[in-house]
């Protein structure tokens, strides 16, 4: 059987390759790192996490929780790795990034049907191919896509939060708590009104890195840099990453005027990231601003925030709900390139693209999950959204049909969760050939 090409070994590409391998389809996995690195990556590992280490909230009231459950049912390698590399994060699924990517890399590299090619792909390969090149798609491949399909690209700039060393945090000025008395997995640095005023002003005056091109900045709303939020108004941060609602300072018995939250990044608890503080500021400015935060005056920064370009397709113009290009049989897109936002969403689209690439290789028709499932709702959005001003999408309850009947918000979401997982499970059970259990892919 001819090998299927998977271009890019991020979360989407890794999941696509794994799905193909589980169905007995040989895979040629292209990854340009380490021969050519990106501005955001630091290793040559597959599924390297370069932004937050959280795969989203868990539970039956959370849309990402439903997508997580669907992926577990599907035998996802990414979910298998996430469950093994989990670190405490309250109601969210967060991972130790080194353990996570290391596990996925070893699982894939050990499979006898996988060929790994460490080189940049500059043209669309012939044959059945999954493109999962991520937000930092190389210029050469982007140009090849434009020549093939027209100028249907959009671009915005993602930003990642700084990480500080736990032992350098002054814990006498912070308190552990989750909002509304939930699990105390977060460190909270409270600010008075005067401290916030000075911090906000410093953000407005801070120098940013100059982008590599002069295109208009189009930020995805879930990943707006903190300095951009500050520019939107004095109170914007107070209703965003610095909101104090539901956090009571035990020293005062009151909610602070503002708060900066830190979340554990690794299993050992040595590294903590500033939640919602994605930034593209120059590094000396980041250090100055972080040290204005109570408790972080002497913080040791182990990773500065970075800003990098994100390239993605105008999915409604180019892709169907099976993630196959409408004008190119046997060519699929997955992950951020396909127009989704988030680690889990990238992996989920990688699963579906890999599944349909395998079915084409086996001479079978393509499939798409039911609309009640979160993955089904997500890919239908990609295929049917308004192409004018198209923006990346992440898992949310607006992607699936509402349930009927009078019930509270919590009960309604729980009902949507149960309905979606049941529909997805039934869809999986009806696949022919069936997806082997994850253990069947072990070697």
UniProtKB/Swiss-Prot annotation:
Its main location: cytoplasm. Its cofactor is FAD. It is found in: Cytoplasm. FAD binds at residues 8-13. Disulfide bonds: none annotated. Keywords: Cytoplasm, FAD, Flavoprotein, Methyltransferase, NAD, NADP, Transferase, tRNA processing. GO terms for biological process: tRNA methylation; tRNA wobble uridine modification. Pfam families: GIDA. Transmembrane segments: none annotated. One of its GO terms (cellular component) is cytosol. Its EC number is 2.1.1.74. SUPFAM superfamilies: FAD/NAD(P)-binding domain. InterPro entries: FAD/NAD-bd_sf, MnmG-rel, MnmG-rel_CS, MnmG_N, TrmFO. Catalyzes the folate-dependent formation of 5-methyl-uridine at position 54 (M-5-U54) in all tRNAs. PANTHER family: GLUCOSE INHIBITED DIVISION PROTEIN A, METHYLENETETRAHYDROFOLATE--TRNA-(URACIL-5-)-METHYLTRANSFERASE TRMFO. Belongs to the MnmG family. TrmFO subfamily. This is Methylenetetrahydrofolate--tRNA-(uracil-5-)-methyltransferase TrmFO. The gene is trmFO.
């Amino acid at each position: 059987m001819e090998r299927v090409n998977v271009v890019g070994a991020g979360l989407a590409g890794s999941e696509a390759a794994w799905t193909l391998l589980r169905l007995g389809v040989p895979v040629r996995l292209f990854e340009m790192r380490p021969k050519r690195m990106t501005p955001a990556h630091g290793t040559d590992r597959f599924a390297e996490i370069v932004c937050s280490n959280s795969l989203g909230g868990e539970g039956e009231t959370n849309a990402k929780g439903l997508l997580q459950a669907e992926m577990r049912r599907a035998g996802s390698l990414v979910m298998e790795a996430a469950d093994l590399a989990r670190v405490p994060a309250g109601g969210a699924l967060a991972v130790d990034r080194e353990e996570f990517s290391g596990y996925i890399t070893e699982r894939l590299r050990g499979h006898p049907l996988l060929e790994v090619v460490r080189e940049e792909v500059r043209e669309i390969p012939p044959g059945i191919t999954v493109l999962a090149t991520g937000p930092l798609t190389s210029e050469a491949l982007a140009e090849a896509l434009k020549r093939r399909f027209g100028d249907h690209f959009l671009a915005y700039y993602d930003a990642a939060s700084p990480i500080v060393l736990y032992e350098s945090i002054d814990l006498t000025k912070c308190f552990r708590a989750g909002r509304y008395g939930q699990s105390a997995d977060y460190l909270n640095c409270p600010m008075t009104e005067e401290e916030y005023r000075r911090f906000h002003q410093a953000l407005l005056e801070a120098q940013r890195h100059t982008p590599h091109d002069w295109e208009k900045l189009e930020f995805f709303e879930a990943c707006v840099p903190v300095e951009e939020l500050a520019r939107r108004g004095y109170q914007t941060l107070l209703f965003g990453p610095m909101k104090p609602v539901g956090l009571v300072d035990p020293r005062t018995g009151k909610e602070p005027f503002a708060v900066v939250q830190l979340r554990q990044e690794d299993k050992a608890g040595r590294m903590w990231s500033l939640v919602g503080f994605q930034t593209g500021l120059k590094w000396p400015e980041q250090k100055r601003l972080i040290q204005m935060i109570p408790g972080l005056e002497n913080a040791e920064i182990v990773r500065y925030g970075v800003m990098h370009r994100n390239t993605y397709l105008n999915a409604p113009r180019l892709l169907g709900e099976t993630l196959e290009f409408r004008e190119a049989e046997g060519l699929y897109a997955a992950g951020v390139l396909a127009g989704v936002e988030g680690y889990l969403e990238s992996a989920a689209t990688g699963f579906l693209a890999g599944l349909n690439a395998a079915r084409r290789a086996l001479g079978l028709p393509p499939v798409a999950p039911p609309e009640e499932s979160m993955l089904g709702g997500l890919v239908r959005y990609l295929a049917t959204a308004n192409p004018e001003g198209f923006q990346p999408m992440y898992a949310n309850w607006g992607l699936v049909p509402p349930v009927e009947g009078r019930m509270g918000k919590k009960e309604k979401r729980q009902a949507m969760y149960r309905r979606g997982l049941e529909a997805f499970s039934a869809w999986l059970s009806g696949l022919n050939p069936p997806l082997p259990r994850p253990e069947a892919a072990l070697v």
